[in-house]
């Protein structure tokens, strides 16, 4: 078999009381499916997933519903050998929030190469939006890791990207906030860091 079919879903309910507004109930759920190539030896690889995400705030200051149709895709092509490849990843969101509908598109073209003791990724993050201020943003997507010994590595990264501010993300920040509509997404132009990691086992290290 060269293709793997994936399907799944989630359902979540959060009930709590907030003084002056009484009982709140936040309901979230999603249904998703996708296809993925499952032969690493093939030159062309792909991973395509589509999800329908539902969210509702009931008994809140102003009950709201949010529906998102999200499509993620990642296509890669191996170059001269398995150690290097080029690819492009994307996420397209079609958002439906009460009477306001808009779409966002995030593209991530990249080049990746690895050797016995180092890995390199050179890419860019391109963010577009329609019916949402018609925004265009660009940021780097760079990562370099160099293994100096068996249990230590030097790393350098510079990245960025869209910061989503839908109802789901806002609930994670503060479920008690008085939110009447999702905020516009932000965009991180640059987040750069350089450091040194060391540790005896995977998952336990200092940096």
Predicted regions and their residues:
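Outer-membrane beta-barrel proteins
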Residues: 19-25, 36-38, 57-63, 75, ...
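Residues on the lipid-exposed face of transmembrane beta-strands in outer-membrane beta-barrel proteins
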Residues: 1, 31-39, 71-79, 107-113, ...
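Beta-strand-dominated lipid-handling architectures at cellular/organellar boundaries
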Residues: 47, 64-70, 74-114, 119, ...
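Exposed, low-structure sequence patches enriched in small/polar residues
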Residues: 100, 114, 119-207
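Flexible loop and strand-edge segments within Gram-negative outer membrane beta-barrel domains
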Residues: 1-45, 51-68, 97
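Transmembrane beta-strands of outer-membrane beta-barrel pores
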Residues: 11-17, 39-41, 52-58, 81, ...
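Transmembrane beta-strands of outer-membrane beta-barrel proteins
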Residues: 3-9, 44-50, 69, 83-88, ...
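Residues that define the transmembrane beta-barrel architecture of outer-membrane proteins
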Residues: 1, 23-31, 63-71, 101-105, ...
